Amino acid sequence: MLKIDHISKTFAKGTVNEKKALDDISLTVDTGDFITIIGSNGAGKSTLFNSISGEFFVDTGKIILDDEDITKKPDYLRSKDIGRLFQDPLRGTAPSMTIEENLSLAYQRGKHFSLTPFTHKHHDVFVNALKDLDIGLEDRLTTKVGTLSGGQRQALTLLMATLVKPQLLLLDEHTAALDPATSIKVMKLSERIAKEHHITTMMITHDMEDALKYGNRILMMKDGKIIADIDEETKKKMTVEELVRKFTETGEANDRVLLH
């Protein structure tokens, strides 16, 4: 379970560029939840993810993950329990290393580091995991990751983030840079992995259809605050038009967030 207790974050405090990115946010995410998060650019969505993953410390409040206070825990220590995918398929992998070497690094998250002996020892584990992706990478373990397509690379990054089951998976617009067909495939794969492994998941999206289609709850953000929290029963009954209408009522709608 993730519990966020009254967190706030202000950047460039005391200057003309001062920006309150998170404003007294409180949130409880139950184990196994799949929450989609919508909001215009600058609403605080990625900043919320950054605060959870430890890219910076919040100014006030607490972040509790699986009954542990991680508020002041460095990002490299949080990475054992928190997996994250970004919009850019180039992030999250080492392009000059092979698929097998990348998986070896991911498999050692939170453990003592070694590479060559570890890779050979867990060859079968990696082959089976790649087969489960069903994108034809199981016979390409020696392929350099930098030669993969964007969709293949994002699917591999998803596997790397979940190879050792995390307490929490953060999906930060992870399909936005992919073509429509590949985006659908990666989204279905994300949903399947989250369900099969019972991984608590939070996903930022600008696609209203995806916000409704995936997950059991929707959060709407504006000006560093959560302004709406839509539960599963309400979400099931909503149409895209109703969700867009609810969003436009906040005065925050723009072309990008209305994509559907």
Give the positions of each predicted feature.
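H-loop/switch region of ABC-family ATPase nucleotide-binding domains
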Residues: 205-206
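Conserved ABC transporter NBD signature motif
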Residues: 61-69
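ABC ATPase NBD coupling module
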Residues: 69-83, 91, 113, 119, ...
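The feature captures the beta-strand-to-loop junction immediately N-terminal to the Walker
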Residues: 38-40
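Helix-to-loop junction immediately C-terminal to a conserved catalytic motif
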Residues: 53
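Conserved beta-strand-loop-alpha-helix hinge in the C-terminal portion
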Residues: 225-249
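A short, flexible loop at the N-terminus of ABC-type nucleotide-binding domains that lies
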Residues: 1, 10-24, 74
